[in-house]
């Protein structure tokens, strides 16, 4: 920071102290997007219902329900909605005049809690000066009213109304939410995580807490062959190989050829029904065989990690060396194998890749690390994401903090050192950064730790004793499929346990919370997202369509503004086209969690504390120079 003279110091101190007394901006929390771009994009566009609330507050005496719906959708989808309205009937001069006036009023209301400087930075370059005049100099009782009227009239007469309204709409979207928190799992079974990443990269202010599915993509890019196999297997399982081929330019020709030559029809490996597009019969056959091939490659690679990392304590997960013909024996039980596809598994060296398998996985890694679009997305994740974040008296973490049954922190040993609680998650963060920094290394300790984060018992992202992928594919006995959850998930409804976790992460304040994602809230079974008397909140977004029959809703999001915390339960989203055509918003039900006695100000926030330090440092500097 440049050295300031006395006058500049005085100006900066006054500015900082003034900012501290503005209302805190609105934070928007989402999680578990699972590649469902359209639903997520809609939630961003409507601010989890905040824009509709603003429209209703400002115009409830002026507009009927249909008119308010139309105004909302002009804000959500300005290009598409305006084109639709133009096609239905010519939009009159009076319509444009009223619409612009209303949108400017929403902008004015939405910008009240921000400094003029911050709003100016958000203004579109083309209309920056005009909008600043309309926002800050407006007073309909003064002689300037004709001045404002002339600005709007000229915009319409010059044929710029559509463009101006579009800019206003996106400005409202930006002002209504100050900061976005994405609490994990951008990636998974949904078809368009790449579009979500593009959307996030254009967002004005955000942070990301990594989920387990984000981790395997980052790990694959960082050199983990086992995680790379998992990524490809999941894409094949959910009929999303086009994500790799078309969106990330990964050539799967060699893998497909090997799969078709080596594996037979095996219905257990048929891709799940894709809710967005019907796969052709040829695509289904390819996905079925690719899934078999990559599942076996995955088992071999994971066995290699377990063999070279005894301190991971995962030897009980080894399976390929336990196969005897059509049976397998482990945990003192013998089972008959089903859906067998072990053609490339050697009895002598079951975890050794064949020459073709090795060529395929090595080639896939080279392509992953060379894909321009994937590189852009993974760099952005590393720039914005972490395993947890403490922000405004809230601990944001996707999965869990591993606990013992008595609520104490579970300890795990890595490289001869024991880690538990916050230190355990910090260790994993260190391993992530180390592995990402050396992508050419595929079997180093840090890279193997990223795979452990995907499926290890002590992982804060996984939160279970074991991942039963092998059992689900190859054993009929349902009891072997069960994945035992860490005690965290039964203890997180206990205030004492949550308080201990918050203390561990040095989260202070009267209204502190843990905000979790990862686990769908089964509302149909009476489960609540509010745990431990409101100390912990679960906001699994429920965007994945496959979960919605289980949960009964399309998940939760959270808003945290100057008036407190507000949990929002969402109904399912039909489609973008249907929504725009029928003004069909996502139906949301809001529930106030915390409402402080006094309105929260910037000085009560994490950023506010930093601004206060800057002000105090400047004041100290002034005194020293006197």
From Swiss-Prot:
Its cofactor is Mn(2+). It catalyses: beta-D-fructose 1,6-bisphosphate + H2O = beta-D-fructose 6-phosphate + phosphate. Its EC number is 3.1.3.11. SUPFAM superfamilies: Metallo-dependent phosphatases. Pathway: Carbohydrate biosynthesis; gluconeogenesis. InterPro entries: FBPtase_class3, Metallo-depent_PP-like. Keywords: Carbohydrate metabolism, Hydrolase, Manganese. Disulfide bonds: none annotated. Transmembrane segments: none annotated. GO terms for biological process: gluconeogenesis. Pfam families: FBPase_2. The keyword Hydrolase applies. It is an enzyme of class 3 (hydrolase). GO terms for molecular function: fructose 1,6-bisphosphate 1-phosphatase activity. Belongs to the FBPase class 3 family. HAMAP family: FBPase_class3. This is Fructose-1,6-bisphosphatase class 3. It comes from Enterococcus faecalis (strain ATCC 700802 / V583). The gene is fbp.
């Amino acid at each position: 920071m440049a050295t300031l003279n006395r006058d500049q110091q005085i100006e900066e101190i006054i500015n900082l102290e003034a900012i501290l007394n503005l209302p805190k901006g609105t934070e928007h929390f989402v999680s578990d997007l699972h590649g469902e771009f359209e639903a997520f994009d809609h939630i961003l566009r409507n601010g989890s219902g905040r824009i509709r609330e603003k429209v209703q507050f400002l115009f409830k005496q002026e507009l009927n329900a249909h008119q308010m719906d139309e105004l909302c959708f002009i804000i959500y989808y300005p290009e598409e909605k305006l084109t639709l309205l133009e096609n239905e009937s010519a939009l009159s001069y009076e319509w444009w005049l009223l619409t612009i006036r209303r949108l400017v009023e929403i902008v004015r209301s939405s910008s009240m809690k921000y400094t003029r400087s911050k709003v100016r930075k958000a203004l579109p370059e083309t209309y920056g000066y005009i909008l600043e005049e309309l926002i800050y100099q407006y007073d309909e009782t003064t002689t300037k009213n004709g001045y404002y009227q002339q600005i709007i009239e000229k915009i319409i007469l010059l044929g710029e109304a559509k463009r101006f309204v579009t800019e206003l709409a996106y400005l409202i979207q930006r002002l209504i939410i100050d900061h976005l928190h994405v609490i994990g799992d951008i990636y998974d079974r949904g078809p368009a995580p790449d579009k979500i990443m593009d959307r996030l990269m254009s967002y004005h202010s955000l942070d990301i807490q990594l989920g387990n599915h984000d981790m395997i993509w980052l790990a694959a890019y960082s050199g983990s062959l086992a995680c790379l196999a998992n990524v490809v297997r999941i894409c094949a399982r959910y009929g999303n190989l086009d994500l790799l081929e078309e969106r990330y330019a990964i050539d799967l020709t060699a893998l497909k050829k090997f799969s078709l030559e080596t594996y037979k029809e095996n219905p257990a490996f048929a891709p799940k029904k894709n809710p967005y597009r019907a796969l052709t019969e040829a695509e289904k056959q390819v996905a079925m065989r690719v899934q078999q091939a990559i599942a076996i490659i995955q088992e071999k690679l994971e066995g290699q990690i377990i063999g070279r990392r005894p301190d991971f304590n995962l030897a009980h997960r080894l399976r390929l060396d336990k196969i005897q013909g059509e049976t397998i024996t482990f945990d003192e039980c013998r089972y008959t194998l089903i859906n067998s596809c072990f053609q490339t598994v050697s009895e002598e060296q079951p975890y050794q890749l064949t020459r073709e398998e090795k060529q395929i996985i090595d080639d896939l890694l080279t392509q992953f690390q060379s894909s321009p679009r994937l590189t852009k997305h993974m760099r952005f994740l590393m720039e914005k994401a972490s395993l947890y974040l403490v922000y405004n008296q809230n601990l944001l973490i996707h999965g869990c903090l591993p606990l013992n049954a008595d609520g104490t922190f579970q300890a795990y040993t890595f490289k001869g050192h024991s880690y538990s609680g916050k230190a355990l998650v910090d260790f994993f963060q260190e391993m992530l950064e180390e592995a990402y920094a050396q992508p050419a290394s595929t079997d180093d300790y840090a890279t193997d730790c990223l795979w452990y984060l995907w499926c290890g018992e002590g992982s804060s992202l996984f939160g279970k004793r074991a991942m039963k992928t092998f059992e689900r594919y190859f054993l009929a006995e349902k009891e072997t499929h069960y994945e035992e959850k860490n005690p965290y998930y039964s203890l997180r409804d206990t205030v004492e346990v949550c308080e201990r976790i918050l203390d561990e992460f040095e989260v202070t304040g009267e209204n502190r919370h843990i905000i979790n994602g990862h686990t769908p809230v089964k509302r149909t079974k009476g489960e609540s997202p509010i745990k431990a008397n409101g100390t912990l909140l679960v906001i699994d977004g429920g965007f994945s369509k496959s979960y919605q029959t289980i949960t009964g809703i399309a998940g939760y999001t959270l808003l945290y503004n100057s008036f407190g915390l507000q949990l929002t339960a969402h109904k399912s989203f039909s489609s973008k086209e249907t929504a725009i055509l029928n003004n069909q918003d996502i139906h949301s039900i809001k529930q106030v969690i915390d409402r402080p006695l006094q309105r929260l100000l910037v000085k009560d926030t994490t950023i506010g504390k930093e601004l206060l330090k800057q002000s105090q440092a400047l004041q100290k500097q002034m005194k020293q120079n006197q």
